[in-house]
Amino acid sequence: MKHSPAETCELLKADTFGHIERVQAGEAIFIRRDTRSAHWLLRGLARWAARHEARGLDRLRGIDGVPQLLRWDGHVLERSYIAGAPMQSAQPRDPRWYRQAHRLIRALRERGLAHNDLAKEPNWLVRDDGTPAVLDFQICWISRGRGGWFRMLAREDLRHLLKHKRTYCPEALTPVERRLLKRRSWLARAWKATGKRVYKHIARRWFGYWDDDGGALSSRRRPQDERGPT
């Protein structure tokens, strides 16, 4: 893809759904997701995912800790850059980080959005100032109301955060949080029993990547942060 002469681009990820790059134009730095390089069989799905992410980011405008939507033209999505390190690298152990992350999830819920992919550590950032941020809204759930389905998805977002807290800061878990961790929804049970296996098979066989953190095993995608990731 052609770039403006004034732009400096660093490739962050390239796969069958297109490519993602960090762009510097003058003093501005942003992230660009380009679906035009997607495999032709998957180009429609790639555009749908990018369009859905644009809708989610538009819903969340102004929330600190979420990328801000800059542009979506039907093929290319541009969003603001957030400096920080992914959870699996930063391994946050400060209880305050988890309280702030809980408030961030609550802010998403108040806008009628559930992230749906917070089990993946690369989707969490520890920013340079030590506060949390959330990335990758391609499969978020956008709701007009607060029905039972939405409430369940929002609880799953929180439960995934608590699982990360159990990994990196277990001594700070409260009795209420421990009880919530034990209360898996029927959706979580079904996903673990069937859906996760199917997803892992497809990710490995078709796209060449998967690990327990949602990271890639393919050489086409290397670990990054928002100095950084996607």
Predicted feature locations:
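Short, glycine/acidic-enriched loop or turn micro-motifs at the edges of active sites
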Residues: 83, 120, 139
